[in-house]
């Protein structure tokens, strides 16, 4: 584990070896000239609260949180932004005072910003989301606020129903039952399952058209199974989630420093399409 005195911002997760966040935040620091020294820390699964508490007792100002600790970060926070309250998930922590840690969630605005950049979304789109885990909670509100109809396809239907019940007051959200569905076409398909999920058929081909957009919230130096499936299925508009990562990182940076980095510059540096 890195010594806490060596940096003032961090990413907490398990595992974090694959993370691009330190590279992105180093770009932000160089671009803005702000003292922003950012490290990734792998936390044992049963030590989140103790490690993070120790972190904030030092002269430390903020942290990002990734899987599997976003729910724990939600309960760890002394104060929450409205979007974090709704998501019941936190990916950004900010030290307000010695007695107050603010929890925020920038995943939703990060996803929406990247979808807009790619021209993958419009008002009232019909969207199918694959998965009903914690990653989905953080991104639903911006999609629903845009007037989109969101359908949740999950292996365990009960989990999808719980998610729909939590968010149906914010917009049009439904459970998609793969075994019993009415024929329809989706404008956008978002994969929110694990990047290592291997499937021969992520969804029925009858649900997509040549104009359907495909977005994988995961990112990797290699194509994920979902990206490969989309290509084989004939998808023409496909993107992984590294753009979302850059945007959510930028909005975390904004939370900490009141400065929004020039995001397209970072995207170009990372050669993101």
Swiss-Prot record:
It catalyses: shikimate + NADP(+) = 3-dehydroshikimate + NADPH + H(+). CDD domains: NAD_bind_Shikimate_DH. Coiled coil: none annotated. It is an enzyme of class 1 (oxidoreductase). SUPFAM superfamilies: Aminoacid dehydrogenase-like, N-terminal domain, NAD(P)-binding Rossmann-fold domains. NADP(+) binds at residues 82, 131-135, 217, 241. GO terms for molecular function: NADP binding; shikimate 3-dehydrogenase (NADP+) activity. It comes from the Bacteria. The active site is at 70 (proton acceptor). InterPro entries: Aminoacid_DH-like_N_sf, NAD(P)-bd_dom_sf, Shikimate_DH, Shikimate_DH-bd_N, Shikimate_DH_fam, Shikm_DH/Glu-tRNA_Rdtase. GO terms for cellular component: cytosol. Pathway: Metabolic intermediate biosynthesis; chorismate biosynthesis; chorismate from D-erythrose 4-phosphate and phosphoenolpyruvate: step 4/7. Shikimate binds at residues 19-21, 66, 91, 107, 219. One of its GO terms (biological process) is amino acid biosynthetic process. Keywords: Amino-acid biosynthesis, Aromatic amino acid biosynthesis, NADP, Oxidoreductase. Its EC number is 1.1.1.25. Homodimer. Involved in the biosynthesis of the chorismate, which leads to the biosynthesis of aromatic amino acids. Catalyzes the reversible NADPH linked reduction of 3-dehydroshikimate (DHSA) to yield shikimate (SA). Belongs to the shikimate dehydrogenase family. This is Shikimate dehydrogenase (NADP(+)). It comes from Buchnera aphidicola subsp. Schizaphis graminum (strain Sg).
């Amino acid at each position: 584990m890195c010594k806490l005195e060596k940096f003032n911002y961090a990413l907490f997760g398990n595992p974090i070896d694959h993370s691009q966040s330190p590279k992105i935040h180093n770009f932000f620091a160089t671009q803005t000239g702000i003292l922003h020294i950012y490290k990734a820390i792998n936390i044992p699964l049963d030590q989140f609260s103790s490690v993070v508490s120790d972190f904030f007792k030092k002269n430390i100002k903020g942290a990002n949180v990734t899987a599997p600790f976003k729910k724990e970060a939600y309960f760890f926070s002394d104060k929450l932004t409205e979007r974090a309250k709704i998501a019941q998930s936190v990916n950004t922590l900010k030290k307000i005072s010695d007695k107050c840690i603010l929890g925020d969630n920038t995943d939703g605005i990060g996803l929406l910003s990247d979808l807009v950049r790619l021209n993958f979304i419009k008002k009232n789109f019909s969207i199918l989301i694959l998965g009903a885990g914690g990653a989905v909670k953080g991104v639903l509100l911006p999609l629903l606020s845009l007037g989109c109809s969101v359908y949740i396809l999950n292996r365990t239907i009960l989990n999808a129903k719980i998610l729909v019940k939590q968010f149906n007051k914010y917009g049009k959200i439904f459970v998609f039952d793969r075994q019993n569905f009415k024929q329809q076409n989706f404008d956008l398909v978002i994969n929110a399952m694990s990047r290592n999920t291997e499937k021969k058929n992520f969804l029925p081909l009858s649900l997509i058209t040549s104009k359907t957009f495909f977005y994988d919230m995961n990112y990797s130096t290699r194509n994920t199974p979902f990206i490969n499936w989309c290509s084989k299925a004939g998808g023409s508009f496909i993107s992984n989630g590294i753009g979302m990562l850059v945007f959510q990182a930028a909005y975390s940076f904004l939370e900490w420093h009141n400065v929004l980095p020039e995001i397209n510059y970072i995207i170009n540096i990372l050669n993101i399409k």
